[in-house]
Regions:
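N-terminal Rossmann NAD(P)H-binding glycine-rich loop of SDR-like oxidoreductase domains
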Residues: 2-22
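SDR active-site strand-loop-helix element
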Residues: 7, 30, 55-59, 99-105, ...
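Adenosine-cofactor binding site in Rossmann-like domains, unifying the SAM/SAH pocket
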Residues: 27-46
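NAD(P)-dependent short-chain dehydrogenase/reductase
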Residues: 129, 140-193
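Catalytic helix-loop patch of NAD(P)-dependent Rossmann-fold dehydrogenases
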Residues: 72-79, 83, 107-149, 156
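Amphipathic terminal alpha-helices
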Residues: 268-284
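NAD(P)H-binding glycine-rich loop region in Rossmannoid oxidoreductase-like domains
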Residues: 40-82
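Mid/C-terminal beta-alpha module of Rossmann-like enzyme folds, strongest
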Residues: 197-245, 249
Length: 284
C-alpha cells in the first residue's frame, strides 16, 4: 500500500478521492488552505513527516467561469500553472517522490491531425493563444521530472459546475466544434493503474489521456437531449459572434501512446462514457 498525496481539492482532485479504492492505497488530499504548497519548506516538511511516496498534483488555474479570467489575472495564472507545479516537481525530485502532474491538452488547435505527444504545440507559448494555454506549455517545457497527464474538458456523472456536461447544459449559446474530452473516472482508474503496477513514470513522461472517438458539440447535445438533459434555450451561433478575451483551443488528441504503452488498460470511447454519465447524472 502506497501513501499518495493529492494536491488540489478542486474538481479533478475531489473526483479522484471519490473514485479511487481506499483499500488499495492510503490517499490523502490537501487544499492550499490546509497546506500552503507554494511554500517549499512547508511542503518538504509535510512530505517527510507523512512518508509520502506519490504526489498527484491537481492544483492549477483554470479560470471562472472559463479561461478568459486568465487574461485579467495573468500573474496568478502563471504562478499556479508554472511556478508552483515546478516547485512541487523539484521537491519530488530531491526526495525521490513519484510525481504525477495533471495538465491540459489545450496547447494544440486545428483538425489537420490527431495531436500526439511528439507534436510541437501550435497553441502555446509562441502562438496567438490564451494565457492559460501558454502557462500549460511553459510548464511542459521547463519540467524534467515525473509524468504529465494531459486531459481535456473533463466530465463525470455528477452535476459539478466544473464538469463539461454541466457547462454545456447551462450555456444558452453554443458553438459546434469537435474536441477530445476526459471521463474523470477513467482518469482515476489510470492513475491507480500507474500506482498499482509501480510504473516507471519516466517512461510515461508526457501522455494524452482522453476518451477516443471524439464527438462534436451537436452530437453531445443530441445525446444529452435523448437522456432528458436538454436546455430549451440552446442555440448554435457563429464563433465570430461571441466575445472572448482569448482564443480557444479546439482539437482532437491522439491516444496511440496510451494504448501502445498500456495495452491491458481498457479505456471506453467518448460516447460510451457519455452514455454512462448521462444515464446516472442527477440535475440539482
Amino acid at each position: 500500500m502506497s501513501k499518495v498525496l493529492i494536491i488540489g481539492s478542486g474538481y479533478v482532485g475531489q473526483s479522484i478521492m471519490s473514485w479511487v479504492n481506499p483499500d488499495k492505497h492510503n490517499y490523502r488530499i490537501v487544499s492550499r488552505r490546509q497546506l500552503d504548497y507554494s511554500n517549499q519548506a512547508l511542503l518538504h516538511k509535510f512530505i517527510l513527516n507523512h512518508d509520502i511516496e506519490y504526489i498527484v498534483n491537481c492544483s492549477g488555474f483554470t479560470g471562472r467561469p472559463n479561461v478568459d479570467e486568465g487574461e485579467t489575472r495573468k500573474k496568478e495564472c502563471w504562478d499556479l500553472n508554472v511556478v508552483i507545479p515546478l516547485n512541487i516537481s523539484n521537491i519530488c525530485k530531491q526526495l525521490s517522490i513519484k510525481y504525477i502532474h495533471i495538465s491540459s491538452g489545450c496547447i494544440y488547435s486545428g483538425y489537420e491531425k490527431e495531436w500526439s505527444e511528439q507534436d510541437e504545440p501550435n497553441f502555446g507559448l509562441f502562438d496567438a493563444s490564451s494565457t492559460y494555454s501558454k502557462s500549460k506549455h511553459a510548464f511542459e517545457t521547463l519540467n524534467d521530472y515525473g509524468c504529465i497527464i494531459r486531459v481535456r474538458m473533463p466530465f463525470c456523472d455528477d452535476y459539478n459546475p466544473r464538469s463539461y456536461l454541466t457547462k454545456i447544459y447551462k450555456y444558452d449559446q453554443l458553438i459546434n466544434f469537435k474536441n477530445s474530452k476526459t471521463y474523470v473516472p477513467d482518469l482515476c482508474m489510470f492513475i491507480e493503474y500507474l500506482i498499482d503496477n509501480k510504473v516507471d513514470l519516466s517512461i510515461v513522461n508526457t501522455i494524452n489521456f482522453v476518451n477516443p472517438d471524439a464527438l462534436d458539440t451537436m452530437q453531445v447535445t443530441d445525446l444529452m437531449t435523448s437522456y432528458g438533459m436538454d436546455n430549451p434555450k440552446w442555440v448554435y451561433v457563429d464563433p465570430k459572434l461571441l466575445k472572448m478575451a482569448a482564443p480557444r483551443s479546439n482539437c482532437v488528441l491522439s491516444i496511440d501512446k496510451l494504448t501502445s504503452l498500456f495495452p491491458d488498460f481498457d479505456i471506453q470511447t467518448e460516447k460510451q462514457a457519455l452514455d454512462y454519465a448521462l444515464a446516472n447524472i442527477k440535475i440539482d
